Amino acid sequence: MRRGVRRIVPLTLGWADLPLDVSIFGAPPDARLREPVPGVLLLCDGGWLLLDTGYNTALITDPVLRRRYHGDPLVQPLLPGPGEPLPDALAGAGIGLDDVHAVAVSHLHYDHAGGLKHFAGRVPVHVQRRELAYGMSGGPEPERNGIFQVDYDDPRITWRQADGDAEIAAGVTAVLTAGHTPGHQSFVVDVDHSAGGGGFVFACDAADLTENIDGELAVGGFVDVPPEETVVQIRKLKCLAAERGYRLIPGHDPVAWPALTSDLATRWPPAA
C-alpha cells in the first residue's frame, strides 16, 4: 500500500498588511487586509518536510535593509515576535531545525523563500527549475516582482529542481501552477491510512484567498502572463481536489488558515 504523510503541522510565520488587489485582481484599490504568512510541516518517511520558509528577518529588522527591500508603505511585512519566526515556530511544535530533512518552496517570493538561510548546507531544497532560473536571471525584474536574490543565492543550498509535476516525498506531489511566478508550484498531500487518510491540496499563491477559489478570481500578482492564466491554475487545483475529495487550502487566507490550524491541532494534538 502506498505510504502517505502521517502528520501535518501548519505554521504561521508572520503576516503581511497589504491592499486586497495584491490577492484579487481588480479589487477596490482602497480595500486592505492582513494576511498570514504560512509554512507547513509534513511528517513523511524519513522525517519532516517543510513547505515554505517565511520572511528573511534581517531584511525587516535592519532599518537600512528594510528601506531597501520593503520600502513600499502599502505592503508591509509583520513578524510574530522579536526572534526568528521559523525556528521559533518549529520549537513551538516541538521540532528542531535538525529534525527537518527536506524543504520545498512554492516559489521564491520573499515571504516564502526568506527562511532558506536556516537550511543552507543542511538539507535539499525542492523548487521548479524555471522558478530558480528566473530568480537567478539577474537584472531588476525579479526584485521588482518580490523575488530577492539575497534570500536564496547561496552556493551551500542543495537544490532539487523539478520540470513540472513531481513527487518530492512519499505522499507529497509538487504540481506546477505557473502564473503568479514563472515556476510557482502547489502541493498535493496524501495522508497515510494509518493517520486517518484523505488529504489536502495546498494552493500556496496560486490562490491566496477563498474568494479566489470560490469565485475563480484571478490573483493580483502574476509574471509574464495575463491575469486570466492564474484562473486556469485555480481551476486545475479545484479539479485535483475534487477528484480526490481533498480540501483545497488557499495560500494566505486570514480566515481559512487559522481554521485549518485549529482543525489539524484537533486531529493531531501537539505533543505534551
What do the PLM-derived regions correspond to, one by one?
Residues 15-88, 186-205:
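Conserved beta-strand hairpin/beta-sheet module of binuclear metal-dependent hydrolase folds
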Residues 29-33, 175-180:
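Short Gly/Pro-enriched turn/cap motifs at secondary-structure boundaries
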Residues 53-56, 108, 130-131, 180-181, ...:
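Active-site metal-binding loops of divalent metal-dependent hydrolases
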Residues 61-80, 209-223, 265-272:
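Active-site gating loops and adjacent loop-to-helix segments of metal-dependent hydrolytic enzymes
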Residues 78-111, 118, 124, 128-176, 182-261, ...:
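Metallo-beta-lactamase
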